[in-house]
A protein has these predicted regions:
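Charged docking surfaces used in two-component/phosphorelay signaling
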Residues: 15-23
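Short amphipathic alpha-helix used as the core "switch/output" element in two-component signaling
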Residues: 39, 61-73
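Conserved acidic carboxylate
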Residues: 8
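C-terminal output helix
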Residues: 104-114
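Helix N-cap/capping motif at the beta->alpha junctions
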Residues: 30-39, 60
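Active-site residues of response regulator receiver
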Residues: 52
Length: 120
């Protein structure tokens, strides 16, 4: 079982993703914006940050950059409808994070999470 921090501003999607990831056997802490994720990241208690890119207050790319400093061993995965932004923006996110474009099937999400965690 891995500990996953989910940052997603869409309430319905966040609840849906949390349930699916928990059913796959992982522990999930979810927040609705990047700024709320920072204290959890600083705790160092998470294996994976699963974050949307477009969120209020702090986008997922900035959140991943801060995560690289606060918890360098934590893996990062983006879920977004704006994959081109993640792939083209020059940034210093940890270890070339995986980008999963919305819409996606839950089995694809869980499969990608398992790949990332097993490679860590």
């Amino acid at each position: 079982m891995a500990r996953i921090l989910l940052a997603e501003d869409d309430d319905t999607l966040r609840v849906f993703l949390t349930r699916a990831i928990e059913r796959a056997g992982h522990e999930v802490t979810d927040v609705d914006r990047g700024t709320k994720a920072l204290p959890f990241i600083a705790s160092g208690d998470f294996d994976l940050l699963l974050t949307d890119i477009v969120m209020p207050e702090m986008d997922g790319i900035e959140l991943a950059q801060r995560a690289a400093t606060l918890a360098p061993k934590m893996q990062v995965m983006f879920i977004t409808g704006f994959a081109a932004v993640a792939l083209n923006r020059k940034n210093e996110t940890p270890q070339q994070p995986k980008v999963l474009s919305k819409p996606f099937h839950l089995r694809d999400l869980v499969g990608e999470i398992e790949k990332i965690l097993s490679a860590a």
